[in-house]
């Protein structure tokens, strides 16, 4: 019986076959015919998200196929197409990402969160909302401030070019830097907006605005112009239909909502309602309210919701809901922050620690608030990975998180 020998060239993933007799042994060695690239793509398209992530390391060819910008559109990965909840816990100097189903069973008041990936929190200071499965986080390392773009599902991350936090010259000092993260659905591009506050002299303030586009090759910051000096507040914003909305303070100390078109990289501004005084509150959140920008705050007794009905006309609608639970029933040691609205129309709320309190998140919970029925349901989270720690903090909760195999 003839022996068959398989030879694989890892660089090009071609498995060849030919009949060739050895001149020394007289034995015949068989090789396989090349596997068409289309067949390789077809095989990859049948794999799960986890398998796809591992297959990137098989060879350069497989990696290049999966890295194609339109790969996920041509061959949808068998990942969870259902939006999920994303929980970010901080343990010591690490951030742990966990996800769970977004909808809960009324007969079971708990959700089981599965562990995704973790990342070092090197003086972690801010986390932007997920955009198509990717997350932008802000970190400080020695005298440098930088952002990480990470994929909680695959564990892949990339550090963006750093900025040194020191004097730019003898008179200019960087006071603060904020990042926002958006996505252009037309050109299918992820972009990061960086706003730097500058202090010149004793009273002169200004801002610099830079944009970075994720993609192949070298990535770098480029300057963009904005005719109105503004300062990004603590909320990093939310991207809805290609527009990045974020709250800001103007040079005259008034507040506004900035609308940054991710594709054109142009700024516009929407005035807030004269009665809208919630933007500086700790529990202030921007949400996607049925495709419109929503701004909300929860003070344990009232839920205040503003919806931007028309950005050009600066028209807002206001709704006030009397919450059915008292402050004591809703964990008076913490503030409640809005994680977003899900398809069922329910608002998700989660506790965050105030300046004087600290909530142990090894036993986390969230609330589902049905606005129409005015019913709040408390749901506990089962997070097995947290059992190995003595203390953890729930930093963020996000709704409508979609797993993504996108490489960065």
Curated annotation (Swiss-Prot):
One Pfam family linked to the record: F-box
Database matches in SUPFAM superfamilies: F-box domain (SSF81383)
Entry-linked InterPro entries: F-box-assoc_dom_typ3, F-box-assoc_interact_dom, F-box-like_dom_sf, F-box_dom
Boundaries of every F-box domain copy: 29-74
NCBIfam families: F_box_assoc_1
PANTHER family: BNAA05G37150D PROTEIN-RELATED, E3 UBIQUITIN-PROTEIN LIGASE SGIP1
Protein name: Putative F-box protein At1g53550
């Amino acid at each position: 019986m003839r022996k068959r020998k398989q030879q694989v060239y890892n660089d090009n993933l071609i498995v060849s076959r030919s009949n060739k007799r050895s001149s020394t042994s007289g034995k015949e060695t068989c090789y396989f015919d090349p596997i068409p690239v289309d067949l390789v793509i077809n095989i990859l398209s049948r794999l799960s998200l986890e398998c796809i992530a591992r297959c990137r390391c098989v060879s350069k060819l497989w990696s290049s196929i999966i890295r194609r910008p339109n790969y996920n559109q041509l061959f949808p990965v068998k990942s969870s197409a259902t939006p999920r909840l994303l929980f970010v816990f901080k343990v010591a100097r690490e951030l742990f990402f966990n996800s769970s189903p977004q909808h809960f069973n009324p007969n079971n008041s708990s959700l089981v969160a599965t562990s995704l990936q973790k990342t070092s929190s090197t003086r972690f200071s801010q986390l932007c909302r997920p955009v198509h499965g990717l997350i932008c986080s802000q970190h400080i390392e020695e005298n440098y401030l930088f952002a990480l773009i990470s994929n909680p599902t695959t564990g892949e991350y990339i550090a963006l070019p750093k900025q040194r936090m020191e004097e730019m010259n003898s008179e200019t000092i960087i006071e603060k830097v904020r990042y926002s993260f958006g996505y252009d659905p037309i050109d299918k591009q992820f972009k990061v907006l960086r706003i730097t506050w500058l202090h010149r002299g004793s009273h002169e303030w200004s801002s610099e605005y830079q944009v970075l586009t994720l993609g192949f090759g070298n990535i770098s910051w480029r300057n963009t112009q904005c005719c109105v000096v503004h300062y990004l507040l603590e909320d990093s914003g939310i991207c809805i239909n290609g527009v990045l909305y974020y709250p800001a303070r103007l040079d005259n100390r008034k507040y506004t909502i900035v609308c940054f078109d991710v594709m054109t990289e142009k700024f516009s501004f929407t005035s807030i309602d004269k009665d809208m005084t919630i933007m500086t509150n700790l529990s202030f959140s921007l949400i996607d309210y049925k495709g419109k920008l929503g701004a909300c705050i929860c003070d344990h007794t009232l839920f205040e919701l503003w919806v931007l009905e028309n950005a050009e006309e600066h028209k807002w609608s206001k709704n006030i809901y009397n919450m059915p639970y008292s402050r004591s029933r809703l964990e008076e040691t913490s503030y409640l922050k809005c994680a977003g609205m899900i398809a069922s129309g329910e608002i998700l709320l989660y506790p965050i620690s105030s300046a004087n309190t600290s909530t142990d998140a090894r036993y986390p919970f969230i609330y589902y608030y049905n606005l129409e029925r005015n019913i709040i349901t408390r749901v506990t989270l089962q997070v097995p990975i947290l059992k190995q720690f003595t203390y953890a903090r729930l930093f963020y909760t996000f709704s409508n998180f979609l797993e993504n195999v996108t490489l960065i």
